[in-house]
Swiss-Prot record:
Part of the ABC transporter complex LolCDE involved in the translocation of mature outer membrane-directed lipoproteins, from the inner membrane to the periplasmic chaperone, LolA. Responsible for the formation of the LolA-lipoprotein complex in an ATP-dependent manner. It comes from Cytophaga hutchinsonii (strain ATCC 33406 / DSM 1761 / CIP 103989 / NBRC 15051 / NCIMB 9469 / D465). This is Lipoprotein-releasing system ATP-binding protein LolD. Coiled coil: none annotated. One of its GO terms (molecular function) is ATP binding. Signal peptide: none annotated. Belongs to the ABC transporter superfamily. Lipoprotein translocase (TC 3.A.1.125) family. The lineage of its organism: Bacteria, Pseudomonadati, Bacteroidota, Cytophagia, Cytophagales. ATP binds at residues 37-44.
Length: 219
C-alpha cells in the first residue's frame, strides 16, 4: 500500500501545557485508523495538526509527499480544500441550504465544475442512503441523516484523506453503528482513507489499526 500521510517529531504546547510530545505517525492509502485515549491525551490536537487545521510548534506533516506544515496559509488553504476532508462531532450543516447544497459547499469554494460536483453530491448521498433527502433542509433530517450529509460533504472533492473527530459522539447506538459501517463501505468502494478520533470502542476495534495516546505520546 502507498503511504498517504506521514508526520514526524510533532510537538505542541499551549501556554505552559505540553500537549504533544514528539509524535511520529503514518497512514497507508485505504486504511481506517482510529486514535483512542483518555480525554486530554492530545488526540484532537494531533488530528487538527495532521489535517492542517493547526500547526505544530516543531515537526512536520506530509500528505502524499507534500509537506503541508511548510506551506503558507494561502497554499495550505487551497490544498486543504482539494485534498483533505473533515467530519466533526457536530454536523455544522447550514440551515438555509438543502442536503445537496450543503454537500456542494466545498466544491463551490474550490471553484469546481458545478454540474459535475452536483452529480457527485447526489451519487454520494445515494451511496449513503439519502437519495430521498436531496432537497430536505437540515431541520427536516434525523441526527443520523444530518451526519451522513456531513460525511458526503467531506468527500465531495474526492480527498486523499478524511479526518473525523468523534463523528458518532452525538448519535444513538443504532445510528452510530450505521455510520461506522459506512466508513468501511466507503473504504471498500472508493479506497477512501480515514483517521478517526473516537471514544467508541466498537469503532476502534473495527479499524485496521488502533493508535493509543496517553499524555501527549503514542504508547
Amino acid at each position: 500500500m502507498q503511504e498517504i500521510l506521514k508526520a514526524g517529531d510533532i510537538f505542541k504546547t499551549y501556554g505552559t501545557v505540553d500537549v504533544l510530545k514528539g509524535i511520529d505517525f503514518s497512514v497507508q492509502q485505504g486504511e481506517v485508523v482510529s486514535i483512542v485515549g483518555a480525554s486530554g491525551a492530545g488526540k484532537s490536537t494531533l488530528l487538527h495538526i495532521l489535517g492542517s487545521l493547526d500547526r505544530p510548534d516543531t515537526g512536520w506533516v506530509k500528505i502524499k509527499d507534500e509537506e503541508i506544515s511548510a506551506m503558507n496559509d494561502k497554499t495550505l488553504s487551497a490544498f486543504r480544500n482539494q485534498h483533505i476532508g473533515f467530519i466533526f462531532q457536530f454536523h455544522n450543516l447550514l440551515p438555509e441550504f438543502t442536503a445537496v447544497e450543503n454537500v456542494l459547499l466545498p466544491a463551490m469554494i474550490g471553484k469546481r465544475n458545478l454540474k459535475e460536483a452536483e452529480n457527485r453530491a447526489k451519487d454520494l448521498l445515494r451511496f449513503l442512503g439519502l437519495d430521498h433527502r436531496f432537497t430536505h433542509y437540515p431541520n427536516q433530517l434525523s441526527g443520523g441523516e444530518q451526519q451522513r450529509v456531513a460525511v458526503a460533504r467531506s468527500l465531495i472533492n474526492d480527498p486523499l484523506i478524511v479526518f473525523a473527530d468523534e463523528p458518532s459522539g452525538n448519535l444513538d447506538t443504532h445510528n452510530a453503528e450505521e455510520l461506522h459501517q459506512l466508513f468501511f463501505d466507503l473504504r471498500k468502494t472508493y479506497n477512501q482513507t480515514f483517521v478517526i478520533v473516537t471514544h467508541n470502542e466498537k469503532l476502534a476495534d473495527l479499524s485496521d489499526r488502533k493508535v493509543v495516546m496517553q499524555d501527549g505520546v503514542i504508547i
